[in-house]
UniProtKB/Swiss-Prot annotation:
SMART domains named in the record: UBQ
Gene from which the chain derives: FAU
Other facts noted in the record for this chain: This protein is synthesized with ribosomal S30 as its C-terminal extension.
Family per similarity comment: Belongs to the ubiquitin family.
Stored Pfam families: ubiquitin (PF00240)
Protein name: Ubiquitin-like protein FUBI
Span of the signal peptide: none
Biological source species: Sus scrofa
Source taxonomy: Eukaryota, Metazoa, Chordata, Craniata, Vertebrata
InterPro entries: FUBI, Ubiquitin-like_dom, Ubiquitin-like_domsf, Ubiquitin_CS, Ubiquitin_dom
Length: 74
């Protein structure tokens, strides 16, 4: 299935739904140079856990995930 990932740019990924959020972060890191530990992946504004698979998170075909950078400070 296709998945859209919006970071600094919009990327289209081909996934099975069995990938973990951590694997998506690693892929975004290779595309955009943002370290995985500095990324927050959001589905409809809700942060996703690294260990969860896309299927467990409710990600369906043609879903758009947002990738935000962690903010320093508080």
């Amino acid at each position: 299935m296709q998945l859209f990932v919006r970071a600094q740019e919009l990327h289209t990924l081909e996934v099975t739904g069995q990938e973990t959020v951590a694997q998506i972060k690693a892929h975004v890191a290779s595309l955009e140079g943002i370290a995985p530990e500095d990324q927050v992946v959001l589905l409809a504004g809700t942060p996703l856990e690294d260990e969860a698979t896309l299927g467990q998170c409710g990600v369906e075909a043609l879903t758009t995930l947002e990738v935000a950078g962690r903010m320093l400070g508080g």
